[in-house]
Amino acid sequence: MKLDKKIIEVNNLKKSYGDIEAVKGIDFYVDEGSLFAFLGLNGAGKSTTIDMLCTFLKADSGKIKIDDFEVNKDDDKIKSLIGVVFQDSVLDDLLTVKENLKVRSKFYNMSKADFNKNLEEIAYVTGIKDFLNRQYGKLSGGQRRRVDIARALINKPKILFLDEPTTGLDPKSRKSVWDMIRRLQEENNMTVFLTTHYMEEAAKADYIIIMNEGKIEAKGTTYELKEKYAKDKMIIYTKNNTFFMHYLSC
């Protein structure tokens, strides 16, 4: 994986809701083709940041560049480059999977031929081919999440934003979705920007930022963060501490 271009650049980004400072002047960048994770508890400012990056929410101040395009100046171009998976699905329970994806393709003025071509590729890579003609509302949680990701991929974006993509899923479904995300990123050199409150999910990323109360508390690779903050220790419980300590001192 070649990481030589900053596809997302954020400088001194701020956002408040009344007296509440949701994002407090953060700075970071994301390398093209990387899997990037925002880790933090609910209310840390992760979703607000994603909404600003995706042009859904206007920042109070600061600067955002997506693939060299500036948010608030080049929003239409930026929207054509990104796909977004929200915490809550935006698809119609009463429509089939294929119908939902076709509706989404209309946002990009996609021709029927292009839609069918993209659908075939996306259905294969996301594993939704077997239930394309089933109603979205009748799918399992894991299947629905796969369709949500397929919706975000219909325009073949350069950057995929995933806001808490596995929340509410059982461990097996979470693993399945994660395997798919990693495969998409590695095989297509796609940049994946993830928010999560699961430590084990963030640990799979190439680079991690830990947010708390609107601020960046720590950042680095998994290895760098472990080296700096984690202390390895072994706890041994014994029935006879005196006997055990004798052998430790030998």
Can you annotate each of these PLM segments?
Residues 160-163:
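Catalytic Walker B motif of ABC-type/P-loop ATPase nucleotide-binding domains
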